[in-house]
A protein has these predicted regions:
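Conserved class I S-adenosyl-L-methionine
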Residues: 1-46, 58-59, 81, 158-160, ...
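C-terminal alpha-helical "lid/dimerization" subdomain adjacent to the S-adenosyl-L-methionine
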Residues: 8-9, 25-28, 143-202
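Short glycine-centered segments of the SAM/dcSAM-binding site in methyltransferase folds
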Residues: 68, 139-141
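A short acidic, Gly/Pro-enriched loop at the edge of an enzyme's catalytic core
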Residues: 101-113
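A short SAM/SAH-binding and catalytic strip from SAM-dependent methyltransferases
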Residues: 112-124
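A short glycine-rich, Lys/Arg-flanked "PGG" loop and its adjoining helix->strand segment in the class I
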Residues: 126-138
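C-terminal lobe and adjacent flexible extensions of AdoMet/dcAdoMet transferase-like proteins
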Residues: 202-211
Length: 211
């Protein structure tokens, strides 16, 4: 699907790129202001919380209102880093290696589902978002931080022209349209903001289940 890659190839790309992603956290979290966005939106998470594509656990410290925290990621490299970083944490996180597009949880399992900078890397982002919707309680919420195609034309053209390199190096579709993906997955946007040339999105979503 993505550059004609199989799921196995996609996972291999992510495991290879995991260490570089972890090492680049300063520029992403501080320079680009992602840490500030994490604190702002994930402080809204409450009850039983699921972090889809939890990576090395960068969201966990911001889940201050959570009753329980469960994290899932398809990268064993990322999960190993998450386990190490959580070793002395004052809270417990239940970590799982698994597929965001086939979550091994019953329907309506979580009060809040969160994900950050992940839909760009899911093999099938629509299916992953629909799975988040499925496991979220009808009166729950889904909180996302995502990145996509810039609203500034010069930046957007750069993203388009270098998409192939981004996929090959890190398995990232950096010119996607996150809000369109969310709508296509059947979720309702309650609140959304865009920052940094329109690249970064924060979204509060409702599962919007019928019946």
């Amino acid at each position: 699907m993505l550059n004609n890659k199989s799921r196995t190839e996609w996972l291999q790309i992510h495991n290879r790129a995991a260490r570089e992603y972890i090492n680049s956290q300063w520029s992403r979290e501080i320079l680009f202001g992602v840490a500030k966005q994490r604190k702002k939106i994930f402080n809204q998470a409450s009850g039983d919380v699921l972090d889809v594509g939890c990576g090395y656990g960068m969201n966990f410290p911001f889940l201050t209102q959570a009753k329980s925290i469960t994290g899932i990621d398809f990268s064993s490299v990322m999960l190993a880093e998450a386990r190490e970083s959580m070793r002395n944490a004052p809270f417990k996180v239940d970590l799982h290696e698994g597929d965001a597009e086939a979550l091994e949880f019953p329907n309506n399992s979580f009060d809040t589902v969160i994900s950050s900078l992940s839909t760009c890397s899911f093999f099938d982002p629509i299916k992953a978002l629909q799975e988040m919707r499925r496991v979220c309680k009808p009166d729950g919420k889904i909180l996302l931080i995502e990145h996509g195609r810039s609203t500034w034309e010069w930046a957007a053209k750069y993203q388009d022209n270098h998409l192939h390199q981004q996929i090959e190096m890190g398995g990232c579709r950096w010119n996607q349209e996150p809000q369109e993906l969310v709508k296509e997955a059947g979720l309702t946007i309650l609140h959304a903001t865009r920052t940094l040339l329109g690249v970064f999105h924060t979204m509060v979503l409702s599962p919007a289940k019928d019946g």
